[in-house]
Amino acid sequence: MPSIQLPVLLLCLTLSGVCLNGRQFPPELSENMGRSSLDDILQRSGSHMLQSVLKKVEKKEEMNKELNMPLPQWLSKRQHPGKRYISDPEKRQHPGKRDVEEKASFGDIQKRQHLGKTEVEGYLVNYLELKKRQHPGRRSLWDQSTDISSSQLTYLNELSKRQHPGRRYLMYKHQHPSKRGWNDELDLSDQNWEKHQQFGNRDRDSDSPDYTGPCDLQQSAICNKDSLLLDLAEKFSKEGVEEKHQHPGRRSAWENETEE
C-alpha cells in the first residue's frame, strides 16, 4: 500500500503546480499578485512535507525487511563488530566457564586441578611427590625404609666391607635417630654384644639344643683333647690381654672374685 500511495501523491502535486503556473489572472485581480510569494511558501512547505513522508515510508520498509530477516543475521548487523558471533557463544564465554564435557579433555582438567584434588588414578604419583617434599623427621618409618633403594644398600654393604672393622656402620651412628630403622638398631646392638663377649664364647648359643659346651666330661671318649687345649690357651691369652687393658683399680675386684 505505501508504494502505491507515493506515486499518486506525486502526480497530484505536480498537476496542482502546473495549473497554478499556467493560470492567467484577470486585470482586476492584479493587486493580488503580491500573494504569489505566499503560494511559493506553500509549495515549499508541501515539498518538505512530501520529503518527510517519503523518508518515513522508507524507514518503515526497512523495518519490515529487517523483521522478515532471520534473527541472528539481524542482530549481527546491528551489533558492534566486537560483540558479534552470537551463533558461537563459546567464543564470548570466559575460558574457565566453557562446556567442560565437549571442549576440555580429562588431561586438561588434571593439569588445571590442584594436587590435592586430582583423581584417584594419579594419587600414588602425587603421594610420592608430597612425600619427597615433607621434612624427613615427619615421615613414617615405612616411608623411611622405602626411601633407601637397593643400589644404596649395596653401596653401604661394599663400603662396610672396605672400611676398618672398628669404623663400620659409622654412617648409621651419625644419622638422626628418627632416620634409623629398628633393624639397624638391632644389628648394632648385636655387634656391640659380640664385642663385649669373650673371644671363646662368641658365635655360641648356650640356649640352643646343639650346643654341648667346650667338652662334655661324661663323654670323654668323644671329646677332642686337642681342641680343648687350644680353646683353653686362647682363653688364657685373651684374659691376659684384657687384664692389661683394664684399669688397675678394676683388676683387684676381678682377682678377689677369682680367689673366692
From Swiss-Prot:
InterPro entries, sorted: TRH
UniProt signal peptide: 1-24
A single cellular component GO annotation: extracellular region
Native species: Gallus gallus
Similarity comment: family membership: Belongs to the TRH family.
Pfam families in UniProt: TRH (PF05438)
Post-translational modification Proline amide, affected residues: 81, 95, 136, 165, 248
Entry protein name: Pro-thyrotropin-releasing hormone
Entry keyword set: Amidation, Cleavage on pair of basic residues, Hormone, Pyrrolidone carboxylic acid, Repeat, Secreted, Signal
Positions where Pyrrolidone carboxylic acid occurs in the chain: 79, 93, 113, 134, 163, 246
Localization in the cell: Secreted
Residue segments, region Disordered: 72-112, 195-217, 238-260
Function description: Functions as a regulator of the biosynthesis of TSH in the anterior pituitary gland and as a neurotransmitter/ neuromodulator in the central and peripheral nervous systems.
Domain of life: Eukaryota
